[in-house]
Design a protein with these regions (language model features):
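Catalytic "initiation/cleavage/transfer" segments centered on a nucleophilic residue
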Residues: 70, 89-131
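Short, conserved acidic/polar surface loops in the N-terminal third of protein domains
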Residues: 37-38, 64, 118-119
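Signature for HUH/AEP ssDNA processing cores
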Residues: 1-60, 68-76, 81, 130-137
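Short Gly/Ser/Thr- and Asp/Glu-enriched loop/turn motifs at secondary-structure junctions
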Residues: 55-62, 99-104
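Conserved hydrophobic/aromatic beta-strand scaffold that supports enzyme active sites
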Residues: 24-26, 65, 104-106
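Conserved short secondary-structure elements within globular domains
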Residues: 78-92
Length: 137
């Protein structure tokens, strides 16, 4: 299985090796009774935009990738604030394992995965592409 870490670039997949935060956060919601209903609620969420949304590899949950503006907050604290907001808006609890910035996630095999339309097939720029002559690590 292929996996990725949505929250940043790392020298090694541990928090202290974080080189650059991606300004993305992966929220994992498990044991969902009605996946399509929750998917629509997340896509229409009042406070958070959706970059990517797909059925988790287990088949009974969703992985929701949202953009974040950390504004000096640590990933862990921002994650907790987002999880509390989601809970306050009546949505299911978020798996707190995502509060670990180094947490990886299996890539989706969901033919119905939502990809934000702002992304095109021919990507012109990528935040993960280092500047000329700059080592990303």
């Amino acid at each position: 299985f292929d996996y990725c870490n949505f929250s940043g670039l790392f020298g090694k997949r541990i928090e202290k090796e974080l080189k650059m935060h991606s300004v993305l956060m992966c929220l994992d919601i498990d044991h969902v009774e009605d996946i399509m209903e929750l998917k629509q609620k997340l896509l229409n969420h009042e406070y958070f935009d959706t970059e990517l949304l797909f059925v988790s590899p287990s088949g009974n949950g969703l992985k929701w990738i949202i953009p974040v503006d950390l504004k000096g907050w640590e990933h862990f604290r921002y994650f907790k604030a987002v999880a509390n907001c989601i809970k306050a808006t009546g949505l299911p609890l978020v798996d707190m394992s995502g509060s670990d910035v180094a947490r990886s996630c299996f890539l989706p095999h969901d033919p119905q995965a939502y990809i934000n339309p702002k992304y095109k097939d021919d990507v012109e720029e990528n935040i993960f592409r280092p500047r000329l002559g700059e080592c990303p690590f």
